[in-house]
Amino acid sequence: MTVSNSTDPDKNHISYRTSGVDIDAGNRLVEIIKPFAQRTLRPEALGGIGGFGALFEVPGKYRQPVLVSGTDGVGTKLKLAFQYARHATIGIDLVAMSVNDILVQGAEPLFFLDYFACGKLDVETAAQVIQGIAHGCEQAGCALIGGETAEMPGMYPEGEYDLAGFAVGVVEKDQIIDGSSIRENDLVLGIASSGPHSNGFSLIRKILDRHAGQPDTGLDETWLVDALLAPTRIYVKSILALLAELPVKGLAHITGGGLLENIPRILPDSVMAHIDQSAWVRPPLFDWLQQHGNVTDEEMLHVFNCGIGMIVIVAPEHALTATNILRSGGETVWQIGDIKSRKPGTPSIVIT
């Protein structure tokens, strides 16, 4: 199709590109990321990337399918990614935050969509980020079926961007995990995290700022950055393998609020969790953060996962089998506590 130009060619014309939005750059990005997305596709995905909407057929193996959705971002962990030009794994964090959330209700993640917003689109950087998103989707077994790249001049500082993700999964109606069956004497298993995951970075950055340039930080800077920016662990495949073998009473993704807030979210009012901190090995990174930030024990447990990224609650007779299944799936697992009866007005969690 041709469009005639009736304006005076001698005048200085304003275009979308001169206004700060490069449509051609956006199109180049789409072509670059298509192969990454293609590797994530499942048989239920109908069509490819580029349509107005993404189509996905609910798997036929479910009798009473219930869709479970979740959305999240990466928070100020992005600031460290910008500072150290580490863009290749931040997309894994984005996927992990949503798929781990829907996983705790027993849902199998089906598909994922992303939102990438920036002031000026750097195609190379955006491609690294979205390749990481695709890698996260592969780890979670879900399809990257669409997304949005928004170039918005004046909205973000140069070199910075923001991310949001959206995941949808499915679970049988009679297999939804909601914690309602948790009883006294059930056991609490903790699965190791890969680091802080994507929470607590405003506090982390404050600690780093306080000690910037000081020679006595106690850790090599490269090691420290690697530890902080380690991508959030995706627990989907190991947890789904566990759910296929035995009944799980409760799951909790340890995100913002730490152990203190996230475990009580799944407990009935009649019980409380007793957690023993000596039962697992807290990674040295958290010791460094606590020491150099002069952070209280309670604040650490309220902000960080402290080395535990996912909680699994099972009946005592299933604990050993559950541990073995999770370990065979590559997880590091500890029995970190148990469930006790709770009297009205008493705490829903005690960590000693």
From Swiss-Prot:
Keywords: ATP-binding, Cytoplasm, Ligase, Nucleotide-binding, Purine biosynthesis
Pathway(s) of this molecule: Purine metabolism; IMP biosynthesis via de novo pathway; 5-amino-1-(5-phospho-D-ribosyl)imidazole from N(2)-formyl-N(1)-(5-phospho-D-ribosyl)glycinamide: step 2/2
GO molecular function: ATP binding; phosphoribosylamine-glycine ligase activity; phosphoribosylformylglycinamidine cyclo-ligase activity
Stored Pfam families: AIRS, AIRS_C
Source domain of life: Bacteria
E.C. numbers: 6.3.3.1
GO biological process: 'de novo' IMP biosynthetic process; adenine biosynthetic process
HAMAP family assigned: AIRS
Family statement: Belongs to the AIR synthase family.
Protein name (record): Phosphoribosylformylglycinamidine cyclo-ligase
Species name: Nitrosomonas eutropha (strain DSM 101675 / C91 / Nm57)
